[in-house]
Amino acid sequence: MIYNKIHFSQEIEKCLNNVYNTNNKEQNFQGRLYAHFLTFEKEGYVVEMETSVNDEHLKPVLLKRMNDSRLSDFKKDDFRKIEIDLLLYKEDFSEMYAAELKWVYNRSEGWNVVDHLEDFKDDAIFCHQLIEKANFNETCSVVVYDFNPKKQVKRYSPRNTETQQEKLEFLGGSYPAADHGKIIVDEHGGKIDFKWIDLKDYKEDQDYKYYIIRFKK
């Protein structure tokens, strides 16, 4: 049985809709999509693209790229993991959004959508590179959102923070993985230094949430 590309496309579109629903759909963004396909016996391969995007033509471009890829060369059971990382950002870097989708194949249960942040560091590094180019000022803030439901977890803003260093916990409150992923944000020289702390005690069977990281002047 060939892997269901229609279902795959629907999940990508759902991810895009979640990102766009957090902001004005009329605003234009640059976009970066990173897709990594890992198989049981064949070597994994990567589909990667970077383009100027907006809500009208981003989705068809990404979906066409997926359908034109080598997905049809594999059967569904060939895959053991599929990772999708999506980053959207305005040309002046004043706003950025990042989201992740991941599928893991379990031989007893089939395909499951896994929503955790284990491999989110690649986009974090890319965000860091963009931040270095941006001219952020004292009004810059970092907001961590829960995808579902979309609620703000915590906000960092240099102008109302007394210390030079503030920790943002990805999973706060009563979430089971509250201490597993953290960001350190340092304010210096009018810019934000975005650093990652490695996830600790990660467990494959735990529940994790989708997140959007938003940078806004």
Name every feature range the model reports, one short phrase each:
Residues 1-44:
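Interdomain/boundary linker segments immediately adjacent to catalytic/signaling cores
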Residues 16-20, 69-75, 104-117:
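Surface-exposed cleft-lining segments at the edges of enzyme active sites
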Residues 24, 28, 32, 81, ...:
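Short, well-structured alpha-helical interface segments that form or flank functional binding sites
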Residues 45-97, 201-203:
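Active-site metal-binding core of divalent-cation-utilizing nuclease and nuclease-like domains
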Residues 82, 95, 137-138, 207-209:
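Residues at beta-strand starts and edge strands
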Residues 87-88, 100, 212-214:
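Short, well-ordered beta-strand micro-motif
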Residues 94-160:
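Catalytic cores of nucleic-acid endonucleases
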Residues 153-217:
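Non-catalytic C-terminal interaction segments of nucleic acid-processing enzymes
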